[in-house]
Amino acid sequence: MTNETYSSPAPIPLSQSDERTWAMIAHLSVLANLVTGFFGPVAALVIYLVYKDRSRYVAYQSLQAFVFQLIWWVGAGAIAGIAWAVSGVLSAILIGLLCMPIACLISFVPLAALVYGIVGGVQTAQGQDFKYWLIGDWVRNTLTEA
């Protein structure tokens, strides 16, 4: 028996068409939140983990989508929960009724995240680079350091 070492083959790079498709799917995974409430960030993370070694473009776009969706999911949920709790407590003294319109508006803010994710999906499908405001540079720096 010989002493042979086997190494895994180098990952096969994605074609530009496949890169655009997977980047688009990562951004559009935000739509999964409409049905499941949580699957969007999971889908974007899975895409990142599967394709990070095969395409820096897909890695960047999918990690951006994951971070963006996670921030929106946690942040918007916490803010809406607090707004409704304050409104509910204060409604006992009628001041809360004044807070309810604000709580309703805050409840609809996650729709902006859906629209932003769709814009990202459309732009990446067209082959354009998409960068989420405030998140994109941080993700790019994180990937560069890795």
PLM region spans:
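Membrane-interface extramembranous regions at the lipid-water interface
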Residues: 2-70, 119-146
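Hydrophobic alpha-helical transmembrane segments in multi-pass membrane proteins
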Residues: 23-43, 66-117
